[in-house]
Regions:
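ATP-dependent phospho-/nucleotidyl transfer catalytic cores
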Residues: 1-50, 63-72, 84-87, 96-97, ...
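Residue immediately N-terminal to the catalytic "proton-acceptor" Asp
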Residues: 51-56
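Conserved protein-kinase catalytic-loop segment immediately C-terminal to the catalytic Asp
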Residues: 57-61
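C-terminal catalytic region of ATP-dependent kinase domains
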Residues: 62-207, 215
Length: 217
């Protein structure tokens, strides 16, 4: 990991799986997830169209900070990026069968943000607790500022010559379009995961204070 504030690389103390992460989060509030990093990783999933983001697709790097254990996400196996599901029958099935609606053909925009995130939604609800709209907006800005058309062009030069055909230009065009639509996609998913308030605690004697506002939140 690279710390931009200190301009130095930092090493993780350990790497754990999602099951162990969730167990530790239930133990105590001394265990915390770096929500900004997780939101950024999830927005990148949506940028490249990778809908296959189940719990085993993540590892968690462990860092100690002021007596707390902070977990930073380490995404892996991004094997459904830029998906293209051809065929009339498959196209119909991915619209008609709820369990298959996450399998969306990659395009400039997202057909349905809710169904695209069907698989990672439970984990998102479990891990994104403190972040508000401005936090999501900052991560969108960070991604869109650092991924330019020039960087995209350079990245695709690493494609093997055997697969560098006309489809590469199509993917690049759609990726640039998706990048321009990322704020709208982020806004839609932020509303989706905030439809319901989920109160999360630990195995300790936690105290919750719940206030009702005039807008019924």
């Amino acid at each position: 990991f690279f710390n931009k504030k200190t301009n130095k690389r930092i090493k993780s103390d350990d790497l754990i799986g999602t099951d162990d992460l969730l167990k530790n989060l239930r133990k105590s509030d001394d265990y915390q997830v770096d929500e900004d990093s997780y939101i950024r990783a999830r927005l990148f999933d949506m940028l490249i169209g990778d809908w296959d983001r189940h719990e085993d697709q993540w590892r968690w790097a462990t860092f100690k900070n002021n007596g707390k254990i902070i977990y930073k996400p380490v995404p892996r196996d991004r094997d459904q990026a830029f998906s293209k599901n051809d065929g009339l029958i498959l196209g119909f099935l991915t619209r008609a069968i709820p369990a298959l609606k996450l399998m969306q053909v990659y395009d400039e925009d997202m057909r349905n943000v809710k169904w695209f995130n069907l698989e990672p939604y439970p984990l998102d609800m479990a891990l994104i607790n403190e972040s508000v709209k401005i936090d999501w907006d900052k991560q969108v800005q960070l991604i869109t500022t650092n991924i330019s058309e020039k960087i995209i062009d350079e990245a695709f030069t690493f494609f093997p010559k055997e697969v560098s055909d006309e489809s590469v230009e199509e993917i690049k065009r759609k990726l640039i379009g998706r990048l321009q639509n990322l704020q709208t996609i982020s806004d839609q998913y932020f509303l989706e995961i905030n439809k319901y308030g989920v109160v999360k605690g630990t195995n300790k004697d936690d105290f919750f204070e719940i206030k009702r506002h005039q807008n019924k939140t």
